[in-house]
Amino acid sequence: LDHYNNILDPQEIKHDAFNLNGREKQYQTFIFYKYLFANDTPVIVTEGKTDIRYIKAALKNLYNKYPRLIQKDTEGKFVYKFSFFRRTKRWKYFFGISLDGADAMRILYRYHIGSNKRIPPYLSYFQKLSGHEQHNPVILLYDNESKSERPLKKFLGEDVHATVDQKAELKANLHMRLITSSKLFVVTPPLIGDKE
């Protein structure tokens, strides 16, 4: 109904994640709850669309080594024990997440913490409402690039405001919990050799 009405609205009326009506805001809240708070399986958010293909191909080759991540069923089909975040037009409209690029992870982090008046702190809202923490982890998987203009460095500096100790923890462990009371993590793959 709202989608149809938005098409009929005059052009000067904006329709995006920051200009939602009451029903749309409730639906935005529901989407966050369903996919990022009460998620049935861990969710992996990647920088690009092709990252998912590479991860799936690698896991299919190594499924015997990682039974906690992937298994082969009786019909020979692979069953993943996690899900990938799928960028859709719905996420673009309700959260402002583009269909490709690392901005999705920055935006999802902002909706976890509530970075300003226009972006609600959904994590604390649902923790207070439900009395429990996130069901399963949400993993922001960044490429391990620490150069100044790369997405990981920008995210840690501009959004997380990571301390020197936090950056050292991420470099040493290849993962870091972003919010103490959450299951939101940033993860990077290991570097090969002396590569940066």
Residue spans for each PLM region:
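Acidic, divalent-metal-binding catalytic cores of TOPRIM
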Residues: 1-196
